Amino acid sequence: MTHHIVIGAGLAGAAAAYSLTARGEDVTVLERHTPANDRGSSHGSARIFRYVYPDRLYTELVVRARELWDDLEAKSGTELITRTGAVDFGDARHTDLLAEIFEDVGVEHEVLDQARAAERWPQFAFDTEVLWHPDAGVIDAETTVRTMLERAVDTWRARIRTDWTVTEVARRSAGGFSVTSATGESVEGDRVIVAAGGWLPDLLGDLDLPEGFVDALPKFEVRQEQAFHMPYRDADADGRPSTPWPTFIHKSGEMFTYGLPGGRDAGFAGQKFAQFNGGKVIGSALEQDGQITDEMRTRMIDYAKRYLPGLVPEPYAETTCLFTNTPNEDFVIDEVDGLVIVSACSGHGAKFAPLLGEFAADLATGAGDVPDRFRVGAATT
């Protein structure tokens, strides 16, 4: 039986382990901290699940991913996505194009003018017409990681090693790989899947990749995003809103903002929102400092006052999160000589988690392929 080593226990790594063990493969997951820890991109209880993309490929992939989410929820008996619906608006959001893609793919949706949208969602101050799709929601990222890893371990085919910092991935002369930790421990396996997120830039030099493959990789940009929660103005005694809140994306010439109902980390008592790619650029996850800036806090307070009248503009539960971006925001999912890379996801990968795991497992086992756009391309051919 093939033994796979998965580096990283965030959403992508956990999904890879889950998919591989479901196929009868053996897996060791190596995590430098703990699964879904707050120094990565998969922590907390609130990530957006949405179908909206100005690109038909991604919308079609969300439809495929949703089937896998439903299957995971059914098998685990755990709700991982809370259905809230989503609104998209703003003069740079091009709701007509998005609605056309929805029509082609078959995603339920509705386009509302400003007046009708304001009547339905008085907690927003819309500046354009609005695209609504009811099947969007909020992903509990931390619970998803835990659930996928538990399912993998329950097969007796997976081991999880925590506080295990990878320092080298070397090819063995007899075939396969030897992965070494900062403490000198080693794990041997036949295949390696790297799902390291913001740590990938530091790992690249330690992966024993062919030169042509490395040269063909896009430039990775790691950002430390800043997110804020603000209380609901119509909150009950527990802080819960009396008016249901959808997730939202607001894209204007001024700023690209996204938001969603906050989860456990915010006591379910506020809307979480942030400026997309508004955080500072850092070399890798090793350089993060977790700091919230006064400039960004003020910017988001001003935004709430202008566009979110249903919130009290007083931030709480402030947090940071890492985005690992490619120049065109496409994913990088590829295999070369027994090593699979599943990163970067450019800040929009959470909704695809179980599908990313399927892609990784397909490449590692040779059972399938991935969209050509996600392949490194020039690689070793």
Q: Which residue ranges define each predicted feature?
A:
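C-terminal catalytic lobe of FAD-dependent flavoproteins
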Residues: 299-381
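Glycine-rich FAD pyrophosphate-binding loop
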Residues: 21-41
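Flavin (FAD/FMN) cofactor-binding and adjacent substrate-gating region
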Residues: 90-155, 159-162, 168-175
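Short hydrophobic core segments
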Residues: 5-7, 30, 187-203, 357
